[in-house]
């Protein structure tokens, strides 16, 4: 039994010894395999880490480059012009946000706009627009009994109709100097004088200067100087016949010193309305150098070389070049773009008397500007004869901020990839005001981005000539949007697109009063409701109707004598 036990014990010892030997061998194999796996894992993790490090480095470089590039563009684009630098503080200001909740909703919604993005989403109904055609350029016969002998000379800014009414010679207009814009441009610097005179020769006799025997007269001393204050804004033709005409016969000359919106209100005879349209839409052609640079601007925006529509033909004439834009810049089809006139310059902001959440510093700054440039308005404020900021906003008298414009475009369905040409002068508040816009719409360009400094040099310090370039880019755009329908450039572009657009020139015109009412609910309104109300607001302005009484024919030319309905 002891032997047996010994055997068993020995067997057991051999068993356990053998078992222990197998464990030693298995442990060595697993250890080697584990080490191999560990080395492979470390290699993979190291490789992935290198990729992440390289990717991070590249993103940092690209981000730095984009920030530097965008920063330089924005500094160049939104910087204050030198001629008003002393009036506007140049230090960086904090970003101005008035509607944080709506802006966040717009930011979340804009990606969905890309799915069904179509830049021409607000075309006017073709079957209605096609029935209206320009007709003010049809020649008139001189009425029987009307003499070709003229009653005298009129020195006037924009009164072709007055010269025709009073049977007088019209002296080429002289532009008044503005302390705001500091522009010395005259008529011949912007428009082709000879073409203007030739085109209207059957309607009005136009001369470039007074005859020598009248040049030496002291026009004010003889009582022939008439200022804007002497004529009521809505004076009728009868006023000019009863008051101005006898003065013209007596002295042989009348100088209207300033003529803003005079003889521009209903009721006007059909033939005078027709003449006003003929002058505005046909007789005024930009000088060749403006046409040439305007053509270059449009071609570079579109990345396309040829004329595309009737608006190109009327605005650019023979100056739509056929040479390539650049070797690598010509596309098979043109880039579509939306032109936006952001009328948020300091003069507009100050004159509106609105509050834009800029705090006490902004209020003091705007008040100081008004005291220099708008003394009459300043006096009204002191006498409590002006609207409060809240009243101005509720009545739709405040220009849209860049933030409000971005929210509106998002509600209308425009995606973040929309190519936007920004017209206008320098945005009040600079980059701090534009950040909310460019975050939603990064593809924003201006003429300063598109044209080289040498190409812009001839127009430097001539705001009227720079505005002519903006007019061309806006008028020929696939879509034109405005932030203030009362501004002169927006009104003229709107009318020009209606008159010459031939059914393919959609324009977005917000009703500022309605939009202000919608925005007043910004803390509670849901995005779907906001979007539908904004779209309805714009679509209702797309209705094709004849010009109502009292509306400007330059902005709404669908009226007898200007456009004819067939």
Region annotations inferred by a language model:
Residues 2-566:
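N-terminal targeting/anchoring "stem" of glycan-biosynthesis enzymes
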């Amino acid at each position: 039994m002891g032997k047996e036990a010994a055997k068993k014990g020995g067997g057991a010892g051999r068993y356990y010894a053998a078992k222990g030997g197998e464990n030693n061998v298995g442990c060595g194999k697993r250890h080697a395999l584990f080490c191999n796996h560990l080395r492979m894992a470390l290699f993979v993790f190291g490789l992935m880490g290198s990729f992440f490090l390289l990717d991070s480095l590249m993103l940092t470089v690209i981000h730095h480059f984009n920030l530097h590039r965008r920063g330089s563009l924005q500094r160049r684009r939104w910087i204050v012009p030198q001629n008003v630098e002393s009036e506007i503080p140049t230090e960086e200001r904090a970003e101005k946000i008035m509607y944080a909740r709506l802006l966040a909703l717009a930011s979340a919604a804009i990606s969905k706009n890309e799915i069904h993005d179509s830049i021409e989403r607000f075309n006017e109904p073709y079957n209605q627009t096609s029935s209206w055609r320009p007709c003010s350029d049809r020649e008139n016969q001189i009425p029987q009994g009307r003499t070709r002998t003229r009653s005298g000379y009129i020195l006037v800014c924009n009164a072709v109709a007055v010269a025709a009414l009073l049977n007088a010679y019209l002296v080429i207009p002289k532009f008044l100097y503005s302390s705001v814009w500091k522009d010395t441009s005259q008529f011949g610097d912007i428009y082709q004088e000879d073409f203007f005179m030739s085109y209207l020769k059957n309607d009005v006799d136009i001369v470039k200067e007074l005859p020598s025997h009248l040049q030496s007269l002291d026009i004010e001393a003889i009582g022939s100087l008439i200022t804007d204050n002497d004529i009521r804004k809505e004076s009728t033709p009868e006023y000019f016949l009863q008051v101005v005409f006898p003065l013209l016969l007596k002295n042989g000359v009348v100088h209207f010193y300033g003529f803003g919106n005079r003889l521009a209100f209903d009721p006007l005879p059909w033939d005078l309305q027709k003449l006003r349209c003929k002058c505005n839409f046909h007789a005024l052609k930009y000088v060749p150098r403006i046409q040439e640079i305007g053509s270059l601007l449009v071609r570079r925006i579109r990345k396309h070389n040829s004329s595309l529509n009737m608006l190109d033909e009327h605005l650019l004439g023979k100056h739509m070049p056929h040479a390539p834009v650049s070797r690598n810049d010509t596309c098979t089809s043109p880039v579509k773009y939306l032109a936006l006139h952001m009328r948020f310059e300091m003069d507009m902001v100050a004159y509106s008397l609105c509050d834009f959440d800029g705090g006490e510093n902004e209020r003091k700054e705007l008040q100081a500007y008004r005291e220099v440039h708008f003394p009459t308005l300043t006096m009204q404020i002191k006498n409590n004869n002006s609207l409060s900021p809240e009243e101005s906003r509720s009545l739709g008298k405040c220009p849209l901020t860049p933030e409000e414009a971005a929210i509106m475009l998002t509600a209308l369905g425009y995606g973040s990839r929309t190519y936007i040409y920004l017209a206008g002068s320098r945005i009040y508040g600079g980059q701090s005001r534009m950040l909310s816009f460019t975050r939603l719409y990064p593809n924003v360009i201006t003429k300063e981005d598109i044209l080289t400094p040498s190409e812009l040099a001839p127009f430097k310090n001539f705001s009227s000539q720079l505005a002519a370039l903006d007019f061309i880019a806006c008028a020929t755009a696939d879509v034109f949007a405005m932030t203030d329908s009362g501004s002169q450039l927006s009104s003229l572009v709107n009318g020009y697109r209606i008159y010459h657009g031939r059914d393919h020139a959609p324009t977005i015109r917000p009703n500022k009063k309605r939009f202000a009412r919608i925005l007043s609910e910004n803390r509670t309104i849901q995005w779907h409701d906001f979007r539908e109300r904004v779209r309805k607001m714009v679509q209702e302005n797309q209705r094709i109707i004849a010009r109502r009484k009292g509306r400007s024919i330059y902005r709404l030319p669908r009226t007898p004598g200007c456009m004819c309905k067939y």
